[in-house]
From Swiss-Prot:
Its EC number is 2.1.3.2. GO terms for molecular function: amino acid binding; aspartate carbamoyltransferase activity. The keyword RNA-binding does not apply. This is Aspartate carbamoyltransferase catalytic subunit. Heterododecamer (2C3:3R2) of six catalytic PyrB chains organized as two trimers (C3), and six regulatory PyrI chains organized as three dimers (R2). It is an enzyme of class 2 (transferase). One of its GO terms (biological process) is 'de novo' pyrimidine nucleobase biosynthetic process. The gene is pyrB. Pathway: Pyrimidine metabolism; UMP biosynthesis via de novo pathway; (S)-dihydroorotate from bicarbonate: step 2/3. HAMAP family: Asp_carb_tr (MF_00001). Carbamoyl phosphate binds at residues 51-52, 101, 130, 133, 258-259. Catalyzes the condensation of carbamoyl phosphate and aspartate to form carbamoyl aspartate and inorganic phosphate, the committed step in the de novo pyrimidine nucleotide biosynthesis pathway.
Length: 308
């Protein structure tokens, strides 16, 4: 698989996923690489981010890359410059890799068609794809169960507006897992019906191996269609309460891509509880992003001696 760019999980095979997990685990165990020359990366985030942004920064730093600063609010984007021209600019100064998060779905397609030398890594596009989050989630699940086939995975919350739901549902299907969705009926996306079954959360808690919660994506919900919930009301109706968590299987785990709205989609203390793998996901995220970037570097011939 050509990893010059990583923009979507659509073309990933099971072997591609397992390769990424193995490589991430190697970095976790102390693997290092040597670059053939100074490598320059830039993270262009047009939406707010804590985990993805800092995780990529840490991954780039650990791999010995040189990071160029970019702030959307102080860039020429505020003067009307298009995303394409912004990326063509940083390509012109010979930046090697751009990690981009953008509110527009499929923003990366125009960049891939522009015949640029710079590699594009998708840090999240609107409600479309979030490949690095999906891969770190697969790593977390694999660490727990050592397989995907036949696992029952519930994705619960604001499904319609979630790029994590789309990427994970798509990838989990390819890996042989059974996917279920839960949440307000108005937020059940039609395009995801091909990937899983929609059921009330009370029907799912006892049967699933993984309960993956999602926050309400207020920034993507138009005001005229917004469903208004008080946090406690939403928790009781659609979230993971103590009572529901008590009914989960002994080996089942709780996941969340974060940020977590404690007391809304999940009881606060469950975030730090025995079943939670939420902060483990974040640690895995750094190593998985090292793996993602390493495959890009390898495709560009920038690793001394190649990847072994």
């Amino acid at each position: 698989m050509n990893m010059h760019d990583l923009t979507t999980v659509e073309s990933f095979s099971e072997e591609d996923v397992l390769h990424k997990i193995r490589l991430a685990e190697e970095f976790k165990n102390g693997k290092t690489i040597e670059l053939t020359r100074p490598v320059y990366a830039m993270n262009l985030f047009f939406e707010n981010s804590t985990r993805t942004h800092t995780s990529f920064e840490m991954a780039e730093s650990r791999l010995g890359m040189r990071l160029l600063e970019f702030e959307a609010k102080t860039s020429s984007v505020t003067k009307g410059e298009s995303l394409l021209d912004t990326v063509k600019t940083i390509d012109a100064i010979q930046t090697d890799i751009a990690v981009i998060r953008h509110p527009q779905n499929d923003y990366y397609k125009q960049l891939l068609e522009a015949d640029l030398n710079i590699s594009i890594v998708n840090g999240g596009d609107g409600s479309g794809q979030h490949p690095s989050q999906s891969l770190l989630d697969m790593m977390t699940i694999y660490q727990e169960f050592n397989h995907f086939d036949g696992l029952k995975i519930a994705i619960a919350g604001d499904i319609a507006h979630s790029r994590v739901a789309r990427s994970n549902a798509m990838l989990l299907n390819k890996l042989g897992a059974e996917v279920y969705f839960a949440g307000p009926e108005a937020w059940m996306a039609e395009d995801l019906k091909a990937y899983g079954t929609f059921l009330p959360i009370d029907e799912l808690v006892e049967k699933v191996d993984v309960m993956m919660l999602l926050r309400i994506q207020n920034e993507r919900i138009s005001q005229d269609t917004a469903i208004k919930f008080e946090p406690h009301e939403y928790l009781q109706e659609y979230g993971l309460t103590f009572e529901r968590a008590d009914r989960m299987q002994p080996t089942a785990i709780i996941m969340h891509p974060a940020p977590v709205n404690r007391g809304t989609e999940i009881e606060s203390s469950l975030v730090d509880g025995e079943k939670s793998r939420i902060f483990k996901q974040m640690t895995n995220g750094m190593y998985m992003r090292m793996a993602i970037l390493t495959d890009v570097l390898e495709a560009k011939g920038l690793i001394k001696g190649g990847l072994h």
